């Protein structure tokens, strides 16, 4: 009969090979990209002071859903909904911080939510050939966008849909783990499973563009 304890022990040995496999299967560069992040809590907020497994690694962070204690997973997708780049950070890292590293080799257009607003970031990316598009806050003046760019920005919520799918399908709940390395294996395995799935959701940019044109 399969032994759960033995399985958990073997997980540690596949971490490096799994990372290498995932890196070799990252998505192609299409010139159009979406960026988003998601919180990965490691425990309930009322247990933060007693939490030991991720002590020194996890940090308090805040999203639109409120405060949490754990990590943030940052992902960049292309228009085929393939993951092009990823980074795991403590929960207190701002969404804009890992963007330069995540997009180091990318050029074209990058679409994100309001969390990625930042003049310096946009200028730095533009200097190396990547234009950042975000929605604006209520107190900001909206920049004029072409119909195509507006349609692409409106399609940004596909990134949230994909992240939700990855977390739900792979039961990406770090609060169940009692080992740091096994938790990281779980994260990499979940992302890899999505990446090699041939039936990814497709983004019909043509229909979105036509909808914007006729609106």
Sequence positions of predicted segments:
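Short alpha-helical elements
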Residues: 1-215
């Amino acid at each position: 009969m399969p032994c759960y304890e033995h399985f958990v022990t073997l997980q540690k040995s596949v971490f490096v090979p799994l990372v290498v496999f995932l890196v070799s299967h990252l998505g192609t560069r299409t010139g159009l990209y979406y960026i988003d992040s998601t919180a990965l809590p490691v425990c309930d907020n009322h247990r933060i002071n007693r939490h030991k497994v991720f002590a020194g690694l996890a940090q308090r962070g805040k999203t639109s859903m409120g405060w949490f204690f754990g990590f943030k997973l940052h992902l960049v997708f292309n228009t085929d909904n393939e993951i092009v780049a990823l980074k795991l950070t403590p929960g207190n890292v701002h969404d804009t911080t890992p963007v330069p590293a995540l997009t180091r080799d990318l050029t074209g257009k990058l679409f994100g939510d309001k969390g990625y607003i930042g003049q310096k970031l946009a200028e730095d990316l533009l200097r190396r050939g990547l234009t950042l598009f975000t929605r604006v806050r209520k107190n900001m003046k909206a920049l004029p966008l072409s119909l195509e760019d507006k349609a692409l920005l409106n399609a940004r919520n596909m990134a949230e849909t994909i992240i939700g799918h990855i977390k739900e399908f792979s039961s990406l709940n770090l609060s169940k783990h009692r080992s740091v390395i096994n938790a990281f294996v779980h994260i990499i395995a979940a992302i890899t499973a999505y990446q090699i799935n041939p039936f990814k959701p497709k983004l019909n940019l043509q229909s979105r563009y036509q909808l914007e044109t006729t609106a």
